[in-house]
């Protein structure tokens, strides 16, 4: 466990979202942009993505998290927060690194939206082919 006044910062990214996570020892309160997690992310799937690093490392209820997240949508933001929490947990205890790494939580998911190409309607969708 960590001392009272120490904190660990982790920056997570997913798609265009960037999350800064500040972990302190506590009782499991998670505040995202000044709101509790239940108010900020209403769907259970997104909350499960966010809490996954803590569930895997069995640190639920041991840390409080204050999170600032910018950019992206709901899925990108929840992924960025999970990545940030995983990085902060790794800084708090080196023994957790193996568990986080084996579950793929320290790897930055670099899948982003593919750019639109000229002559196409979207990234890959071509206009309808006409024979004559």
From Swiss-Prot:
Start and end residues of each stretch annotated as Disordered: 100-132
Superkingdom field: Bacteria
S-S pairs: none
GO cellular component, one term: cytosolic small ribosomal subunit
Biased amino acid composition, Basic residues: 114-132
InterPro entries on file: Ribosomal_Su5_D2-typ_SF, Ribosomal_uS9, Ribosomal_uS9_bac/plastid, Ribosomal_uS9_CS, Ribsml_uS5_D2-typ_fold_subgr
Record keywords: Ribonucleoprotein, Ribosomal protein
Keyword Ribonucleoprotein attached: yes
Statement: the UniProt record of this protein carries the keyword Nucleotide-binding: no
Name of a matching Pfam family: Ribosomal_S9
MF (Gene Ontology): RNA binding; structural constituent of ribosome
Any single biological process term in GO: translation
Record NCBIfam families: PRK00132.1
Protein family per UniProt: Belongs to the universal ribosomal protein uS9 family.
Record's protein name: Small ribosomal subunit protein uS9
Taxonomic source organism: Dehalococcoides mccartyi (strain ATCC BAA-2266 / KCTC 15142 / 195)
């Amino acid at each position: 466990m960590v001392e009272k006044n120490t904190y660990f910062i982790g920056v997570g990214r997913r798609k265009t979202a960037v999350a800064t996570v500040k972990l302190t020892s506590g009782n499991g309160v998670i505040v995202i942009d000044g709101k509790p997690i239940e108010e900020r992310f209403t769907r259970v799937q997104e909350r499960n993505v966010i809490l996954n690093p803590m569930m895997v490392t069995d640190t639920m209820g041991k840390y409080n998290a204050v999170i600032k997240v910018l950019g992206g949508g709901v899925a990108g933001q929840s992924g960025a927060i999970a990545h940030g929490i995983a990085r902060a947990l790794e800084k708090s205890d080196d023994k957790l690194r193996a568990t986080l790494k084996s579950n793929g939580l320290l790897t930055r998911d670099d899948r982003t939206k593919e750019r639109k190409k000229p002559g196409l309607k979207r990234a890959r969708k071509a206009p309808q082919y006409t024979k004559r």
